């Protein structure tokens, strides 16, 4: 029993000392964190610009946009037609009671 109590006491003291050491440790300043963040964003932007310059990626993007345009054009035309029909239905409803 004494061994168990001593073990628990030792673990408690060690965890408290660890917490104390963590509190006393120097925290990184906000300026260094912001500087590191901007450096990372800048590096990422440079890498992205290098990747965008490749002709293969440009060809893939162009093919994607052309395919999207081919697929969306009929949908947009149908949506426009449906909208005109929908609005004309309400215009006809409004003019109908006036003629009766």
UniProtKB/Swiss-Prot annotation:
Keyword terms: Cleavage on pair of basic residues, HDL, Lipid transport, Oxidation, Phosphoprotein, Pyrrolidone carboxylic acid, Secreted, Signal, Transport
Chain positions found as Phosphoserine = 54, 68
What is one GO biological process annotated to this record?
Answer: lipoprotein metabolic process
- The PTM Pyrrolidone carboxylic acid maps to 24
Q: Which GO terms describe its cellular component?
A: spherical high-density lipoprotein particle
Tissue expression: Plasma.
Location in the cell? Secreted
Q: Name one Pfam family in it.
A: ApoA-II
On whether DNA repair is a keyword of this UniProt record, the answer is no
Indicate where the modification Methionine sulfoxide is found in the sequence. Answer: 49
Segment forming the signal sequence: 1-18
A molecular function annotated in GO for this UniProt entry is: protein heterodimerization activity
Question: InterPro entries under this entry?
Answer: ApoA-II, ApoA-II_sf
Keyword Secreted recorded: yes
Q: Which family does it belong to?
A: Belongs to the apolipoprotein A2 family.
Quaternary organization: Monomer. Interacts with NAXE and NDRG1.
Tell me the function of this protein. May stabilize HDL (high density lipoprotein) structure by its association with lipids, and affect the HDL metabolism.
Q: Which PANTHER family match?
A: APOLIPOPROTEIN A-II (PTHR11027:SF0)
Q: What is this protein identified as?
A: Apolipoprotein A-II
Protein source organism: Macaca fascicularis (Crab-eating macaque)
* Name of the coding gene: APOA2
């Amino acid at each position: 029993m004494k061994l168990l109590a001593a073990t628990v006491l030792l673990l408690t003291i060690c965890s408290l000392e660890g917490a104390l050491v963590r509190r006393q440790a120097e925290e990184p300043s906000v300026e260094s964190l912001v500087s590191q963040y901007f450096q990372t964003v800048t590096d990422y932007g440079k890498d992205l610009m290098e990747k965008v310059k490749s002709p293969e990626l440009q060809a893939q993007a162009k093919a994607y946009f052309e395919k999207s345009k081919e697929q969306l054009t009929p949908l947009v035309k149908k949506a426009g037609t449906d909208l005109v029909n929908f609005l004309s239905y309400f215009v006809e409803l409004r003019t109908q009671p006036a003629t009766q």
